[in-house]
Amino acid sequence: MSAQSLPAATPPTLKPPRIIRPRPPSRHRAPHSPGPLHNGSSPKALPQISNDASASVCTSIFWEPPTASLKPPALLPPSVSRTSLDSQTSPDSPSSTPSPSPVSRRSISPEPAPCSPVPPPKPSGSSRTPLPSGPTPLQDGSASAPGTVRRLAGKFEWGAEGKAQSSDSLERCSQGSTEVNGEKETPEAALSGNGSQENGTPDAALACPPCCPCVCHVAKPGLELRWVPVGSSEDILRIPCRASPLRASRSRINPPVISHPPVVLTSYRSTAERKLLPPLKPPKPTKVRQDISTSEELPQPDLKLPSEDGIQTATKAWEGDRPEGAPLNAPPVALEGREEEGLDGLKGLQWELPLQDEPLYQTYRAAVLSEELWGVGEDGGPSPANPGEAPTFSRLPGPRNTLWQELPAVRGSGLLESLSPQERRMQESLFEVVTSEASYLRSLRLLTDTFVLSQALRDTLTPRDHHTLFSNVQRVQSVSERFLGTLLSRVRSSPHITDLCDVVHAHAVGPFFVYVDYVRNQQYQEETYSRLMDTNVRFSAELRRLQSLPKCERLPLPSFLLLPFQRITRLRMLLQNILSQTEEGSSRQENAQKALGAVSKIIERCSAEVGRMKQTEELIRLTQRLRFHKVKALPLVSWSRRLELQGELTELGCRRGGVLFTSRPRFTPLCLLLFSDLLLITQPKSGQRLQVLDYAHRSLVQAQQVPDPSGPPTFRLSLLSNHQGRPTHRLLQAASLSDMQRWLGAFPTPGPLPCSPDTIYEDCECSQELCSEPSTPSKTEGQSLESKAPRKHLHKNPEGWLKGLPGAFPAQLVCEVTGEHERRKHLRQHQKLLEAVGPSSGTPDTPQP
């Protein structure tokens, strides 16, 4: 290899250029078809290049593009015409000659970066042509208007010509790879992306010039090359760079480029600068919220509410600051520029459109409790000092439900000035029923969508646990949706709400009974949730993940499970507030009383069902502790049975000895369990177990105090018929006098009252009567009797009237059902006879302690 083919020596501090060995041509080019040269220069001029080029910093590389890669003359830009290229073949180029970046052997990137429209060099044995090194003139010989690149706020802008050139360079970049020694080679600028990219958009105007192996274009770690077009920037129109290489279609022919301004290397820039620049994001539409104090005079749109089948509410004005330059009397931006089709589409949406800003019901309930704690009025603000003065509604910090006075239709109709303060408070109370139901429904939907319908959470539970944990909450949600839709259809009729209590009453006597079924399982819900959190690790982990979602606002799952019972109780409080503000004798008062009575019945039934379920759970736990040893087992769990009294007593007995020893007292600890219809006598054992000693029906148990002023309180407990059908007696000692009085009061002696000849029966011993003759309400004081209908009486007077469940009826119209009740009655009569005769009748004496 001759010394002339080697590049010039470089200083030690600079990286030497890469030596590319030319490859001999595969065949000799025919003299008659030399092929078009890229720059139009003659091959004879090539040997005249002196060796003075070795003294320069940049070493020229001569190349000739293959015939297949050349475009037709019609597709070549005018800036690269033969005339313009011939003018740049002089080897004495200025120092501002474009210096391409070095080449590399890396593979082509799937996302082509912008690169120079000039093809890269290809070493071959054919005639070599130097790269263009001067400004590119136009076809008419005039200098082209150079493009300009500006960096403003993290984005690049350039002229109209530069934009067209960048789009053309994107297509040529994909074809700019060269073959060196049989391998595919891609320019460094196309791979490393010397043009900086901000926010995912490449700077097409900052594309590198044609590649060259000179040391001034060597890429440095952590730095990138900065390229700036030569020329003035005053005549260039600035257009933001939004071009992306992925959007450039290869099948689409780019428009011809008028000119290609030369670029020069100015400096290196650290790649850390990109991280310091904020990303460019499209501006978000500003939500305009109207101030309450200044929006009273603003014209507001009409109230837009759905029909009965929809669940859409009134249009709610945005709250917040106005954008700069917006007039005070301008409508909200959200309604500006909307066509009629857009408004019709909004009417078809559900209630989230107007009430989407309503807080969750947990937040609403906390705000209500805070207002009640700090003395804030029920209408949303403190009561005015002067009763005739209009109340001012001050909002507590944090999310809060919408007030009636904030509705655009209310402000536009002038109702705030025409209504009295009392009527305004009534409107706020009525509208709170709607907004609170919207918040409640939003929380229910969040519970259903996030927890109930979560497949990941369902996979951690068994079907039984999943049903017990969530019960029929989806049915409760559907009832709430229908209820809210009916309320909104009433509010839609007029901004001035006439009444809503009739709607509440219609739903309370029908669909609201689904709350009873849900609240009944509340005890099982709490136990299942506690058990799963302690034993099921997968469930607890998935539940914590769901609760941490932003839409859940870090609220726990139990707060969602308690929503139905909290809502029905809050609805009763709202009805009480409405009833207190109604006028005497008005239709509002009548409807409020009916609605309040219906909702109160549901709450009472819910409370009764909750208590009954707790009692059933208590019976189940108690059954697990009982041990029937030498006693016939008894099924204890029953829907009608409940535990009324439980306590520990001490039985006094005598221990009989031999001939040399006399009898001495014996103390045995007992535990008595008194149910609604049964008495169990048990003895405590280890491990909280209870061994059953005896049991009897409650109506066959009697208790009598033993007079002993010096000793502890003692009473005698008699079972007229125990589990074996025999009478037994026990002498029991209580820990205190109050405990003894409790047990004595639990077994009252049946008979007439001291001041009345009527007979009072206990619930456990009342008889059942069967109607033998139907009667009309005139004969039965308002209670009708049907044939063969059973009745239960608790009170019997000498006139022959029986008062019980459900009312009073004459005794001659019914006949007592014989059976177990008759047998127990005869046993009691026999016991009274034995007590009247005395100890000689065979009743054992009670041993004295």
UniProtKB/Swiss-Prot annotation:
Residues 65-110 have a biased composition (Low complexity). Residues 18-31 have a biased composition (Basic residues). This is Rho guanine nucleotide exchange factor 15. Phosphorylated on tyrosine residues upon EFNA1 stimulation. EPHB2-dependent phosphorylation at Tyr-361 triggers UBE3A-mediated ubiquitination. Ubiquitinated; UBE3A-mediated ubiquitination and degradation by the proteasome promotes EFNB1-dependent synapse formation. Residues 48-59, 164-180, 771-786, 840-849 have a biased composition (Polar residues). InterPro entries: DBL_dom_sf, DH_dom, Ephexin-like, PH-like_dom_sf, PH_ephexin. At P12, expressed is detected in the CA1 region and the dentate gyrus of the hippocampus. Its main location: other. Keywords: Cell projection, GTPase activation, Guanine-nucleotide releasing factor, Phosphoprotein, Ubl conjugation. In a mouse model of Angelman syndrome where Ube3a levels are reduced, levels of Arhgef15 are significantly increased and ubiquitination is reduced compared to wild-type litter mates. Specific GEF for RhoA activation. Does not activate RAC1 or CDC42. Regulates vascular smooth muscle contractility. Negatively regulates excitatory synapse development by suppressing the synapse-promoting activity of EPHB2. GO terms for biological process: negative regulation of synapse maturation; positive regulation of stress fiber assembly; regulation of postsynapse assembly; retina vasculature morphogenesis in camera-type eye. Gene3D superfamilies: Dbl homology (DH) domain (1.20.900.10), Pleckstrin-homology domain (PH domain)/Phosphotyrosine-binding domain (PTB) (2.30.29.30). The gene is Arhgef15. Interacts with EPHA4. Interacts with EPHB2. GO terms for molecular function: GTPase activator activity; guanyl-nucleotide exchange factor activity. The modification Phosphotyrosine is found at residue 361. It comes from Mus musculus. Residues 111-123 have a biased composition (Pro residues). It holds the Pfam family RhoGEF. GO terms for cellular component: cytoplasm; dendrite; glutamatergic synapse; postsynapse. Disruption phenotype: Significant decrease in RHOA activation in brain extracts. The modification Phosphoserine is found at residues 107, 109. It is found in: Cell projection, Dendrite. Residues 425-609 form the DH domain.
